[in-house]
Amino acid sequence: MLRYTCHALFLGSLVLLSGCDNSSSSSTSGSPGSPGNPGNPGTPGTPDPQDVVVRLPDVAVPGEAVQASARQAVIHLVDIAGITSSTPADYATKNLYLWNNETCDALSAPVADWNDVSTTPTGSDKYGPYWVIPLTKESGSINVIVRDGTNKLIDSGRVSFSDFTDRTVSVIAGNSAVYDSRADAFRAAFGVALADAHWVDKTTLLWPGGENKPIVRLYYSHSSKVAADSNGEFSDKYVKLTPTTVNQQVSMRFPHLASYPAFKLPDDVNVDELLQGDDGGIAESDGILSLSHPGADRRRAGRYLCRRAEALSYGAQLTDSGVTFRVWAPTAQQVELVIYSADKKVIASHPMTRDSASGAWSWQGGSDLKGAFYRYAMTVYHPQSRKVEQYEVTDPYAHSLSTNSEYSQVVDLNDSALKPEGWDGLTMPHAQKTKADLAKMTIHESHIRDLSAWDQTVPAELRGKYLALTAQESNMVQHLKQLSASGVTHIELLPVFDLATVNEFSDKVADIQQPFSRLCEVNSAVKSSEFAGYCDSGSTVEEVLTQLKQNDSKDNPQVQALNTLVAQTDSYNWGYDPFHYTVPEGSYATDPEGTARIKEFRTMIQAIKQDLGMNVIMDVVYNHTNAAGPTDRTSVLDKIVPWYYQRLNETTGSVESATCCSDSAPEHRMFAKLIADSLAVWTTDYKIDGFRFDLMGYHPKAQILSAWERIKALNPDIYFFGEGWDSNQSDRFEIASQINLKGTGIGTFSDRLRDAVRGGGPFDSGDALRQNQGVGSGAGVLPNELTTLSDDQARHLADLTRLGMAGNLADFVLIDKDGAVKRGSEIDYNGAPGGYAADPTEVVNYVSKHDNQTLWDMISYKAAQEADLDTRVRMQAVSLATVMLGQGIAFDQQGSELLRSKSFTRDSYDSGDWFNRVDYSLQDNNYNVGMPRSSDDGSNYDIIARVKDAVATPGETELKQMTAFYQELTALRKSSPLFTLGDGATVMKRVDFRNTGADQQTGLLVMTIDDGMQAGRQSGQPCRRHRGGDQRRAGKPDAAGLRRHIAPAERYSAGGGRPVAGERVQVAADGSVTLPAWSVAVLELPQASRRALACR
């Protein structure tokens, strides 16, 4: 595949073929030419009769390696490159991802987890590997993705047994087609198997296949794929390529390709012509052919195009003179603007004009088009199908949509009719200008449906909607007001842009609050399931689930079985499946058609800021698209500029899927522009105050920093943070990871404190979920029957907790578990530096968020059997205290203050309202409501069964107590600036820890914060945190006179509950302190008119 455009255009597929006519692949040579212009090497033309004629080799066509037997299916992967390789091919990493759904359910052993790569080949021969797949029946179909590791070689495919009656099929890497036989696939595979040629600038091609070959050409076809004709000859137009060197600029932009051999295209090559069809690189030497079809990836449309394209505005833009429609589609052969009426009838179709300098297409219309619906009719070569496709597609720059995102709509976001009263004057309640401002952030992560779907005090028509946040007297809004008053400053909304996986047509949806009969109507699979008898029961889905949970067990997990059917047609999804990046999601509006969602979204933002007193953060997902390819309804960008917006495998050309879905390519300039343009709309037109980037490590650091600078020009106080996990993309660019972002001011989530407090890691399963206790669940002080944690390991977890509470600073100095003086970066975290930040505002500390099990469920997994319900509630409070009283930005999941449970669900993204319930009436924490989804948690059923009934299910008393604890902690954080110092140098001067080293009292964390009033003398005593089953006496401090620091929240503790410290902390005259078990105390030492704090 060749690459070249704003970073390179990834072109075609490469195959190594051996032999031509049993001897040579070429004949006499001459100069390439074209009609009327013979011999011009820069213009693709018909080959001169005297030039080399390239032919296919004489390779035997294969038969089937194996045929499917009864209740089996067979999939062959035809590997042309392997056939001609001089060494045997290794297929050990090739595997299948297999899954059932309501319409495709013949598999007897579907793969439960995307990271499960165990379905390796059954066998292989010289033509490639094959798999024998067991079936439950010989009718229907199966879903399959062929992968190398977790990267797709072929996008999602369905094998229908009505189409392939012998259930034996073949596929080719990089090609979505399914073939009836290996012979058919083999014949189609020439030129398709690999894609390792990369067009990196206007005249440079990097291609291993051309190395040391005397004849290297780039073939081209505008109407069909480059392929041999019936005589086995390649007769399409071509240009010659000559060897060159890789310049430093290319090496810096594409470090993972820097070692590839380079070839030069003619200076006068017509790039536009090459971009709009299929291209094929062919090299020949001594009878060995290398073929690459550069058209297989239009990934980069020319740096020279991007510079001009970046300066333009896209979408439907309203001006004084009318509406300008513009779309960037440099590889398209034709684009038409299709205008639709409100009832979606075609009104007009207008050919758009291509700007050759930018690759953008545009059309100018009148102002009467405001409110009109439209789509783009594309004529474009798509490398996945290897043909010129014709289809309509919505506008990736759309600002409004029809129901279910089927049409884009022309809209003026400045229209006063789309703004609630007072919108233009709305400001953020909490300043974000300085590090000290940012350090005060306490973020409450929330999901629109989770906020109100179950709240009976919210009007029925608003439940699960944006406008639920305007229901001032509802339990949910009143609860959020209490959190805000106690110190929660920000609400973060899980994805609220346009989602791909929730149907916005209400007649196609059945939620659990609705009659079971409706579920049967919209999901026909229910009628043939074990639950069919409920279709005429008159019950709601919720009532049936409530009935089923009474007898739910690991051996008969009926709740999850029914909920899996519900999930196929309900309104629930977390939303990490972007469809249109810059339009509010329609299912959260009372009317998904057109502009209602815009005004309702703004009304919600206004209510959060004015009534709740919180700033608003938005969760954004630019690291992947929901789909790619020419056929999927939710593929948008990839239909417009095929394979430009997606990150491709540099060898096969297939779309990478390391994120979860179709990886995007923010390293490409025009996608980076789309991201920045999208963020600008959310910032200016929707008044979002911060952005949380999903899987930010898949973005280049430079792109994130560039976007931040762009958005800070619009709002200087904007805050960026995200998931800075290592994405293994560092060979391509410097990734936006935890360590790389040190000193930038951009925040990243810290897994260091998370894992130390919770115990284990996010991928634990089975007994490991119980064995791996953490600081917050008994490590070293209250071991369970399975734990193997040593005292040394428990002390190391305490070190990571201390470091996290100091803001995870790379240069913070502390005494470690062995008594050694170390910097934060020298504290080990699974082989990585424990401390990585320059300032605590670059660290987002948490012990619970939407990913993985809730904090309560993890405590339930890990707590010792003798830990009673009250102790477990206090474990939750003590765990949260590490976040709330630490120096990093505090982050927490909605419902942690209510002991929120998801009934042990590891990944509740599509587990619906049943498992994601939050009860703002404080009656039920949703614990033990059925076994979680078997596809994710089936391997955990045994351990769940052993621990789930260890203590009583929390009720109103425990939820009120935990709410009081939570508000006490947030009020403590708010009560003094010493908890939120913000600056790394200041933290290192003022924060220290006691009770450290090899002789420490296990289970006692003591942190001191000096207010700086007396240089050279300790002016504060630790916030003290004690875990364990008995009272603990902390050693004598440096100064007497300590007293308890009282948080205002204690005056309104819900239900008159005790503070987190339980019985009053005992402070002796000499300054020694005695703490109850599982408690937190903040002490202060009065000093003149100022106070210094001692925490934990």
Curated annotation (Swiss-Prot):
Residues 24-34 have a biased composition (Low complexity). GO terms for cellular component: plasma membrane. Its EC number is 3.2.1.41. PROSITE patterns: PROKAR_LIPOPROTEIN. The record marks 851 as: Transition state stabilizer. It catalyses: Hydrolysis of (1->6)-alpha-D-glucosidic linkages in pullulan, amylopectin and glycogen, and in the alpha- and beta-limit dextrins of amylopectin and glycogen. It is found in: Cell membrane. It is a lipid-anchor. A lipid is attached at residue 20 (S-diacylglycerol cysteine). SMART domains: Aamy. Residues 24-50, 1014-1044 are annotated as: Disordered. Keywords: Cell membrane, Glycosidase, Hydrolase, Lipoprotein, Membrane, Palmitate, Signal. Homotrimer. This is Pullulanase.
